[in-house]
């Protein structure tokens, strides 16, 4: 079983399509936008389940033995959102908790970050993970 958080989004839905076409699966999407208009991106996919974020950890615990990999693409990406505690809970804390769950369950965790961390690009685009390079990043908003 492969889980894709943010699987109803643009990148996530394309990943789900590619995984399905390659025969990987069963596939599970975790996304708040899995229903309604945003759900059209995954409506034609053969999914084992489409779950809300609030159901994520109970679902993982129930399917622990079946889980092969987690692609973590889910996040609040709105550049207009200004609630720092919401970002901390949904983007940072959830990512950390999901990574810990995967590490504990020995499940592969694939995380996609965002170019938003670089800011306007004035400092260039470098994946240098040193403290100095990370301190130089100037994201334009809370998402970055």
Model-derived regions, located:
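N-terminal Rossmann NAD(P)H-binding glycine-rich loop of SDR-like oxidoreductase domains
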Residues: 2-24
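SDR active-site strand-loop-helix element
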Residues: 5, 30, 70-74, 109-115
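Short glycine-/acidic-enriched loop or helix-start segments at secondary-structure transitions
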Residues: 13-15, 38-39, 81-82, 120-122
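Glycine-rich phosphate-binding loop and adjoining beta1-alpha1-beta2 segment
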Residues: 29-56
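NAD(P)H-binding glycine-rich loop region in Rossmannoid oxidoreductase-like domains
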Residues: 44, 53-90, 101, 119
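Catalytic helix-loop patch of NAD(P)-dependent Rossmann-fold dehydrogenases
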Residues: 89, 93-97, 104, 108, ...
